């Protein structure tokens, strides 16, 4: 059995290691603000990060620029670190922003499995030598076509590619096999080298970093217009490119102690009563804006996120339905419900029970609840206000309508 060290693709001498360490130390600020990989995502806040941060700081005074003007520092009282909760994390880009640029302790969550894994990589994981080496090994095995001759045929290939006459075209057969293969191999790498599975022993942070990198890389070769509610009838150029794994980010500085990630319904009693949220400085809420359920728009990513052994288990394998093969047990969010007071009741419960000093909520002029109603609900639990900015509408290919909408950032200072 080869040891992990013998499998490393990039070997450095002691002198080179010392030089690399010194270089990394001087480049921390640059690495912290490097642009990470991210999903093509409905409602991504990547383009709004500066506006959101500036508005939060104007309201709370919690975020100040570093003395050198290059990176920010976060402080709640005196020199203590700000605790920032991002409970509808989605792409994880907001969590990553406040972790890397402002040094916040981040507590993130999303009800979708794929999102919670990606967000964990952004909230807690670092890009270390083991992550780098395993990704390099997986890419080398793909280059050597280790996945062919049936080795890479798994759940994704059988159900979401045109394999053996299947009509679904979310991925090419070749890319689906590549995805299935690396998912299986990642589970093998996860175990300790002495356990007989040929693994290298990955920590939870390392495992989720690599899995998140697989998810982002799979999304980059998907054959969809924007989301996975449908697939294209012909493979576009992006989908034909061979699937390879690129690291989701290259941040090397450890997260603040106490940072963590959940995969939970935000309205569950267990989540709302979790002691980790007690005394949180800021809770940022970026809920669904309309009736589109994220579980139905990104379901293949949830499939890829699951351990392959679950997908072949009679008791755990998802039951698929319809032309697209959507799982029947998709999570249904009450924040997507129009009518019947369901959405309003969900927000009311959330604002009432969150143990936090400040709540900031992103919404827009086309969301389920109008601006006035949201201010009314928030006002039941403290002082509420809203800031606005013009923003371009999300579109997949073409949209014949207004190109700009009003983006809202609501603020609640809890009583």
Report each predicted region and the residues it spans.
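Conserved acidic residues
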Residues: 265
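S-adenosyl-L-methionine
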Residues: 2-15, 29-64, 82-85
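Class I S-adenosyl-L-methionine
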Residues: 371-375, 382-415
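Conserved proline-anchored active-site loop of SAM-dependent methyltransferases
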Residues: 52, 82-98, 108-113, 276-297, ...
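Class I S-adenosyl-L-methionine-dependent methyltransferase module
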Residues: 105-107, 111-251, 295-341, 345-346
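Intrinsically disordered, low-complexity terminal tails and inter-domain linkers enriched
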Residues: 14-32, 62-80, 191-200
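Short conserved loop adjoining the S-adenosyl-L-methionine
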Residues: 268-277
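Conserved Class I SAM-dependent methyltransferase catalytic core
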Residues: 329-381
């Amino acid at each position: 059995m080869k040891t992990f060290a013998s499998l490393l693709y990039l070997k450095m001498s002691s002198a080179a290691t010392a030089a690399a360490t010194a270089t990394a130390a001087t480049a921390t600020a640059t690495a912290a603000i490097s642009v990470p990989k991210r999903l093509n995502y409905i409602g991504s806040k990547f383009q709004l990060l500066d506006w959101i941060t500036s508005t939060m700081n104007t309201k709370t005074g919690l975020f100040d620029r570093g003395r050198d003007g290059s990176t920010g520092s976060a402080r709640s009282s005196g020199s203590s670190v700000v605790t920032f909760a991002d409970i509808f994390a989605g792409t994880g880009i907001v969590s990553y922003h406040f972790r890397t640029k402002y040094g916040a302790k981040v507590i993130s969550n999303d009800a979708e499995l794929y999102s919670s894994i990606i967000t964990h990589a952004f909230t807690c994981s670092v890009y270390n030598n083991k992550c780098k080496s395993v990704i390099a090994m997986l890419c080398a095995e793909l280059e050597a076509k280790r996945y062919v001759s049936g080795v890479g045929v798994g759940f994704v290939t059988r159900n979401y590619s045109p394999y053996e006459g299947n009509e679904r075209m979310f991925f090419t057969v070749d890319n689906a096999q590549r995805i299935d293969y690396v998912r299986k191999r990642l589970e093998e790498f996860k175990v300790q080298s002495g356990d007989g599975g040929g693994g290298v022993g990955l920590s939870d942070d390392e495992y989720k970093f690599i899995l998140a990198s697989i998810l982002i890389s799979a999304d980059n070769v998907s054959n969809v217009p924007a989301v996975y509610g449908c697939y294209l009838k012909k493979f576009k150029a992006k989908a034909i490119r061979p699937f390879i794994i690129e690291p989701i980010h290259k941040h090397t500085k450890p997260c603040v102690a106490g940072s963590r990630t959940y995969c939970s319904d935000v309205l569950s009693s267990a989540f709302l009563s979790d002691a980790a949220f007690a005394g949180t400085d800021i809770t940022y809420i970026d809920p669904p804006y309309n009736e589109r359920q994220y579980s139905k728009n990104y379901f293949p990513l949830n499939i890829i996120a699951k351990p392959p052994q679950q997908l072949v288990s009679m008791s755990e394998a998802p039951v698929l339905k319809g032309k697209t093969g959507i799982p029947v047990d998709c999570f249904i969010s009450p924040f997507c419900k129009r009518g019947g007071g369901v959405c309003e009741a969900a927000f009311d419960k959330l604002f009432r029970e969150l143990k936090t000093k400040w709540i900031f909520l992103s919404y827009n002029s086309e969301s389920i609840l109008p601006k006035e109603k949201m201010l009314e609900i928030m006002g039941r639990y403290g002082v509420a206000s809203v800031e606005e900015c013009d923003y371009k509408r999300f579109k997949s290919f073409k949209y014949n309508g207004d190109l700009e909408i009003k983006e809202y950032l609501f603020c609640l200072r809890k009583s």
